[in-house]
Amino acid sequence: MSKAAQLVNAPWRVKLSLVIMGLGQLCYGQIIKGLLYILSLAGLVVYFAARGAEDLAGIFTLGTKQENLWLGIEGDNSMQMLIMGLFAVMVLVFALALYVSNVRDVLYTSREAAKGRRPHSFRQSLAAAADGKFYVSALVLPIVGVAMFSVLPIVFMILMAFTDFGGEVVHPVLASWSLSAWQKILGVGEVGGTFGKILVWNVLWAVVSTAINFFGGLGIALLLGKRNVRGSKIWRAFPILAYAIPGFISMLGFKFMFSQSGPINQLLTASGHDAIFFLANVESAKWWARGIGFFVNAWISIPSIMLMTTGILSNIDTQLYEAASIDGASRFTQFRKITLPFVVFSITPVLIGQFVGNFNNFGIYFFLRGGLQSNYGGYFLASDTDLLINWLYNLSVDNNYYSIGAAISLVIFVITGTLSLIVYMRSAAYRKEETFQ
């Protein structure tokens, strides 16, 4: 029998709980449970009557009352109304879930009563929740926490991308729902041009830096794994020391080394050469700065890849190489057919994480160039080494272009999430898991 048919043919006590939560439980003698449902209903009614209904309406209007200090009018705050509206939606979802649990509970109680069994007391219900349905009870608080502190901010950011909030439209000016942020970043204007250039550079940076880190770490692991290398343990300690030093200290150290008055330029001038503008805000420094960024990122990231691949290489059966040598395979062929597939299979999830981390690597160029903004090349509040995450920071934190920043963060999520999912689903680590077991 369907749920709808059960409700139609249910006893009158069940139908009471359909109208007012908890009444059915009271009629079945479950006093404490019924009172808890009734108190929950009363609290929800008070909340929605006091401000919940207004908050739900505010998520659609984003405010209707403009602030006027001269007339003493305290206007609406659009972003506050948006986030409170989202909170009201979460409360509404909770209310619906509570109502469904109330109906299920009273239906279960009615079936037990029809069988001549006594309805569970509140203590028995608690014992059942702690025993048979412990997984539900244990997940309640984590789910509420994730919803409040993870889901709510993410949804808030996504919705902000579809408003005109930012720039001149900040409190006390009322925001409205708009696609203006997307029109700007996808258009042909200054913002759109900057977005296109930074996006291309961001993808190039993520792919190349991930490849450098992987092959650099694998190369060092292979080199130090050779039997004829003396003191390999000592040599292996040097990359580990670079990995152990906090990243921002390494970045600031390299910034000093490549600065206008740093040691490298001092050596150049002492040897009769002109100083090079490695990190300066000039067009000639564009690829110098980008190349230094690749080098610094490799310095920080290669040691971790080296450590992982060292352990992976030690698990490869040496008989595979012996058989390949007997068949006449060259060293490069052995690397391409045996070593590389085995390592890539084992490290694919890590490489995906490295790609996403490099795509969102805020610190490299922020610490190297101090967040400067190019005065050439037609960049809007950005430099020629900025990644999307750096540009997002400049737009939202320094210049209050919040909706554009939210739209860019949504683009970052779509790109990294889609590429990561596609690469992983097509990788041997997912499709041929049993091959290397």
Predicted regions and their residues:
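N-terminal signal-anchor/first transmembrane alpha helix
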Residues: 2-14, 19-27, 31-34, 38-46, ...
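A structural signal for multi-pass alpha-helical bundles of membrane permease subunits
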Residues: 49-59, 134-437
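Primarily recognizes Gram-negative and organellar outer-membrane beta-barrels
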Residues: 60-64
